[in-house]
From Swiss-Prot:
<keyword id="KW-0328">Glycosyltransferase</keyword>
<keyword id="KW-0536">Nodulation</keyword>
<keyword id="KW-1003">Cell membrane</keyword>
<protein>
    <recommendedName>
        <fullName>N-acetylglucosaminyltransferase</fullName>
        <ecNumber>2.4.1.-</ecNumber>
    </recommendedName>
</protein>
<dbReference type="GO" id="GO:0085029">
    <property type="term" value="P:extracellular matrix assembly"/>
</dbReference>
<dbReference type="InterPro" id="IPR029044">
    <property type="entry name" value="Nucleotide-diphossugar_trans"/>
</dbReference>
<dbReference type="GO" id="GO:0030213">
    <property type="term" value="P:hyaluronan biosynthetic process"/>
</dbReference>
<keyword id="KW-0472">Membrane</keyword>
<dbReference type="GO" id="GO:0050501">
    <property type="term" value="F:hyaluronan synthase activity"/>
</dbReference>
<dbReference type="GO" id="GO:0005886">
    <property type="term" value="C:plasma membrane"/>
</dbReference>
<comment type="function">
    <text>May be involved in the synthesis of NodRm-1, a sulfated N-acyl-beta-1,4-tetrasaccharide of N-acetylglucosamine which initiates a series of events in the host plant species leading eventually to nodulation.</text>
</comment>
<dbReference type="GO" id="GO:0000271">
    <property type="term" value="P:polysaccharide biosynthetic process"/>
</dbReference>
<dbReference type="Pfam" id="PF00535">
    <property type="entry name" value="Glycos_transf_2"/>
</dbReference>
<dbReference type="InterPro" id="IPR026463">
    <property type="entry name" value="Chitooligosach_Synthase_NodC"/>
</dbReference>
<dbReference type="InterPro" id="IPR001173">
    <property type="entry name" value="Glyco_trans_2-like"/>
</dbReference>
<dbReference type="Pfam" id="PF03142">
    <property type="entry name" value="Chitin_synth_2"/>
</dbReference>
<comment type="similarity">
    <text>Belongs to the NodC/HAS family.</text>
</comment>
Length: 485
């Protein structure tokens, strides 16, 4: 049994050494630059490129979709902005139809209705090929943008060498359950440690899908590769954000992170959907890691350490945990060294995160360690053994129809008209009424909510079986800007 104890101690010691080096260097590079290009650009840059915002949605809750679209409509961007909402063959179009009607007369909004569910990637591509802006912002349909997100991402994209940039993600439903609180802290660490350090070298390895901006000229070069991703002869239908980011880096473009472009997204509130999400992400990470390895010689040495730390670290932790468990079950002896080392590493990381974020709640992130060891590490092992499986686990994807009668339906607004209808007029009234909340929202980063009642006689039951009678719409806290043509 000495072999098990030695294996466990050696693996956990190696894990501690690797993690200490990796996290220390990461924390050093993750510190914000003293003179950021964003600060300098705010005074010098005057070019305002056209931006196309793409919102793919599939069976989205109407309340959530309304909040997303209203946050986009309330952007303070000074340039031209067009919004393309892509309904990816949703079965609940009758339910979301009132949300569409709110923006049906806004010349900035267009709706692309796909006949069948073809997946997020092809839904994005349908909108990209229907649009023409200089920059393309992808926004998930369950994401709410702060009012200045488009402006700040555009400022970062002023350098033609930058192909993509992402904003900081937070959990909009953070206070819902203990799990959503953990995920919110996980997002903060992923953005402000991992992405921030990678951005120091212009090589963010994954510009997250909920809020990522791309340069159209770069997309034009990569769109065919992006659309036709295959793994072991099978089409890959998830992990589109990571794959597109890797393609950008492979083509020689830089990828950046903008920490003050805040986007709040809905995160899983229970373990089952969370584990399904983590399984998809693990598969896409392993697939694209093979591509990332080929890029490392062309990137800074830190990126090599980053890839090694993210892949070898979990492996060492898994080996030490398995050996410690076997030692406990077979020999009956407690693996003190392994347990104390993991506990010490967890405590130090959580304390450092609490100091950097200036929030004591990060001490509670220590709860993530047992979840990682007991659930996520076995899940990653399963993902590695099932890399060829491209199932979303939550929906089925079909091929894009090619028959003439089943082409995507694009509903363009009637240009020159202001939002009409009871819902549209009421929404504009609510915008004007709550201007004063803008300063409070900016101080506390709270998204004000207004209730918008839509007069309609036809509703379909939502997921809970109840007939919705209210749509909650996020409202901007400034006067609506006149539509730009």
């Amino acid at each position: 049994m000495d072999l098990l104890a030695t294996t466990s101690a050696a693996a956990v010691s190696s894990y501690a050494l690797l993690s200490t080096i990796y996290k220390s260097v990461q924390a050093l590079y993750a510190q914000p630059a003293i003179n950021s290009s964003l600060d300098n650009l705010g005074q010098a840059e005057v070019v305002v490129p056209a931006v196309d915002v793409i919102v793919p949605c599939f069976n989205e809750n109407p309340n959530t979709l309304a909040e997303c679209l209203e946050s986009i409509a309330s952007q303070d961007y000074a340039g031209k902005m067009q919004v393309y909402v892509v309904d990816d063959g949703s079965a609940n179009r009758d339910v979301v139809a009132p949300v569409h009607r709110i923006y049906a007369s806004d010349p900035r909004f267009s709706f692309i209705l796909l006949a069948n569910n073809v997946g997020k990637r092809k839904a994005q591509i349908a909108a990209i090929r229907s649009s023409s802006g200089d920059l393309v912002l992808n926004v998930d349909s369950d994401t709410i943008l702060a009012a200045d997100v488009v402006t700040k991402l555009v400022l970062k994209m002023h350098d033609p060498g930058i192909g993509a940039a992402m904003g900081q993600l937070i959990a909009s439903n953070r206070n819902q359950t203990w799990l959503t609180r953990l995920i919110d802290m996980e997002y903060w660490l992923a953005c402000n440690e991992e992405r921030a350090a990678q951005a120091r070298f212009g090589a963010v390895m994954c510009c997250c899908g909920p809020c990522a901006m791309y340069r159209r000229s770069a997309l034009a070069l990569l769109l065919d590769q992006y659309e036709a991703q295959f793994f072991r002869g099978k089409p890959s239908d998830f992990g589109e954000d990571r794959h597109l980011t890797i393609l950008m880096l492979k083509a020689g473009f830089r990828t950046e992170y903008v920490p003050d472009a805040i986007a709040a997204t809905v995160v899983p509130h229970s373990l089952r959907p969370y584990l399904r999400q983590q399984l998809r992400w693990a598969r896409s990470t392993f697939r694209d890691t093979f591509l990332a390895w080929r890029l490392l010689p062309e990137l800074d040495g830190y990126l090599t350490l980053d890839v090694i730390g993210q892949n070898l670290g979990p492996l060492l932790l898994a080996i030490s945990s398995l050996a410690a468990l076997a030692q406990l079950l077979i020999d009956g002896s407690i693996p003190w060294w392994t347990g104390l080392t993991i506990a010490a590493m967890t405590t130090v990381r959580c304390c450092v995160a609490a100091l950097r974020a200036r929030e004591l709640r990060f001490i509670g992130f220590s709860l993530h360690t047992p979840i990682n060891i007991c659930l996520l590490l076995p899940l990653k092992a399963y993902a590695l053994c099932t890399l060829s499986n491209s199932d979303w686990l939550s929906r089925k994807v079909t091929d894009m129809p090619t028959e003439e009668g089943k082409q995507p339906v694009i509903l363009h607004p009637n240009a020159g008209r202001s939002p009409a209808g009871v819902g549209g007029r009421l929404l504009l009234f609510v915008r004007r009424r709550y201007r004063s909340l803008h300063r409070a929202w900016r101080r506390r980063r709270v998204f004000p909510v207004a209730i918008v009642r839509l007069s309609t006689n036809k509703w379909s039951a939502d997921d809970s079986g109840r007939k919705p009678s209210v749509i909650r719409a996020r409202v901007g806290c400034r006067r609506p800007v006149a539509p730009r043509h």
